[in-house]
Regions:
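A conditional alpha-helix N-cap/helix-loop micro-motif detector
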Residues: 78-81, 122, 184-185
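HTH-adjacent hinge/linker in prokaryotic transcriptional regulators
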Residues: 2-8, 14-22, 27, 33, ...
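Catalytic core of membrane glycerolipid acyltransferases/transacylases, capturing the structured
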Residues: 112-129
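Gly/Ser/Thr-rich loops at beta-strand to alpha-helix junctions
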Residues: 104-107
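A short, charged, Gly/Pro-tolerant segment at domain boundaries
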Residues: 29-30, 247
Length: 251
């Protein structure tokens, strides 16, 4: 299954540090198109780096670029992410206490929140906090801890942060009818789980490329989600599926 393959592939790359594409194609008996999709998921999360003819594992002990992790991903589907951010921001009301997840899509919300009043934004993402620093109309609370250099987020035992949220805006690597919501970072996944359980309303922010994708870490079931915010109408399969789950689709 896709879920198990991606998990095994990432473990294999981590163990060997550098692997050629031909080796991955042969070992996992997949097409080049499937390999490219899997590697893109890993690359988007900063887990690997692509090199000519193969990949290398992104060991966190290596030096960190002066460019923020969020900035590195800014160019991927940027127009779609901006659109999703605008839709999500329209849901925020004066007086809300919200959680904004890491990721460039959730970050775009802030571009459309300059006129809100008495809104508290809680996040574990350094880039989100740096943007809020320039927005005096918002109160920012940073969920501190140990920083992850590859994602620019802080991780810590989530039980130390028992905040209650009126709304949570969560990013995801994959949306699947069979595996629900998945990502490729166990620490981030644990934070997402905790926030979703503490929030009155949960919104998933995902562009069209995230549908029918299964990453190796499951972090939430659809029963806890109020709406999926995306950039275009998904396939009828997903339209019917979300309707059956009473989840609103916004696009």
């Amino acid at each position: 299954m896709k879920y198990n393959r991606q998990k095994e592939m990432l473990s294999y790359i981590e163990e060997n540090k550098s692997v050629r594409n031909e080796e991955l194609l042969s070992r996992f008996n997949i097409s080049i198109q499937t390999l490219r999709r899997d590697l893109k998921i890993f690359e988007d999360q900063g887990l690997i780096e692509k090199v000519y003819g193969g990949v290398i594992y992104n060991d966190r002990r290596e030096s960190v670029s002066s460019v923020s992790p969020l900035e590195k991903r800014e160019q991927s589907n940027s127009e779609e992410k901006e659109y999703i951010g605008k839709l999500a921001a329209a849901l925020v009301e004066d007086g809300d206490v919200i959680f904004i997840d890491s990721g460039t899509t959730a970050y775009r919300m802030l571009h459309y929140m300059k006129d809100l009043k008495n809104v508290t934004v809680i996040s574990h993402c350094l880039d989100v906090m740096m943007e809020i620093r320039r927005m005096p109309n918002l109160t920012g609370i940073c969920v501190g801890g140990v920083i992850q250099h590859d994602s620019g987020t802080f991780v810590v035992d989530s039980s130390f942060y028992p905040y209650n949220y009126s709304k949570a805006f969560i990013s995801t690597v994959g949306i699947s009818a069979s595996k629900s919501l998945t990502n490729t970072n166990l620490y981030e996944g644990a934070m997402k789980q905790h926030v979703i359980n503490q929030s009155a309303a949960n919104y998933i922010l995902a562009d069209h490329s995230k549908f029918d994708v299964i990453a190796y870490n499951h972090f939430a079931d659809f029963s806890l989600i109020k709406a999926i915010i995306t950039d275009r109408k998904p396939s009828e399969k997903f339209v019917n599926f979300f309707e059956s789950k009473q989840i609103k689709l916004m696009y």
